[in-house]
A protein has these predicted regions:
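Rossmann-fold dinucleotide-binding core
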Residues: 1-102, 110-138, 172-198
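Short acidic alpha-helix initiation/capping motifs at coil-to-helix transition points
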Residues: 78-81, 143-150
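Conserved short loop/turn motifs at secondary-structure junctions
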Residues: 107, 139-142
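Domain-level signal for soluble alpha/beta catalytic cores
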Residues: 154-157
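Glycine-rich anion/phosphate-binding loop at the beta-strand->alpha-helix junction
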Residues: 166
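C-terminal catalytic subdomain
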Residues: 201-202
């Protein structure tokens, strides 16, 4: 196809609904010859940094754009697992309420931990059902996956790259999906979470 003047551009896109409205992060790869043709359009529609730089640049040949997007998603798997473990520690270890945990996450979002995931997690903890019970306590405790975290972990294994955080996050999702097995195991090995002696403010 290249000999015929037809060039391939494989582009990872990230941003969800907010990205669709206000501009996504764009990760183009493929035929270098095509970059100058698509650059003006891609960088015009991409999200911008605080200093106006577009969140879009050429990342490499062939499938590099989608590879970067895959790794980006893998990193998010790790981030979400850390959020889950922080929530469980606060709830079961420190005995904090959903409102208290919301306050912590909202404060974190004003620091170097500021991120989209921290922001929406804080909002989730604040959301109440019609009966006033925090919605987070009613959500089914299972998690699915689309495969990008698994692909990232497999690539890390294939290349001998230590990536334990993301790999463990993938396994945590596998475990979360096994709801019947977890319920059965709990009946045999029921253990009450131990409280932690600690300062909630810390």
């Amino acid at each position: 196809m290249r000999e015929q003047g037809i060039h391939f551009v494989g582009t990872g896109v990230s941003g969800g609904e907010e990205g669709a409205r206000f501009g996504p992060s764009i990760m183009p790869g493929g035929s270098p010859e095509a970059w100058e043709s698509v650059r003006p359009v891609f960088q015009a529609i991409a999200a911008k940094t605080d200093d106006g730089e577009p969140c879009c640049d050429w990342v490499g040949n062939d499938g590099a754009g989608h590879f970067v997007k895959m790794v980006h998603n893998g990193i998010e798997y790790g981030d979400m697992q850390l959020i889950c473990e922080a929530y469980q520690f606060m709830k079961d270890g420190l005995g904090m309420s959903a409102d208290e945990i919301h306050t912590v996450f909202a404060a974190w979002n004003k620091t170097e931990l500021d991120s989209y995931l921290i922001e929406i997690t804080a909002d989730i903890f604040a959301y109440k059902d019609d009966d006033g019970v925090p919605m987070v306590e009613k959500i089914l405790d299972t998690a699915g996956q689309k495969g990008t975290g698994k692909w990232t972990a497999i690539n890390a294994l294939d290349h001998g790259i230590p990536l334990t955080l993301i790999s463990d996050a993938v396994f945590a999702r596998c475990l979360a999906a096994l709801k019947p097995e977890r319920v059965a195991a709990e009946s045999h090995f029921a253990i009450t979470p131990q409280k932690v002696n600690g300062d909630k403010q810390e």
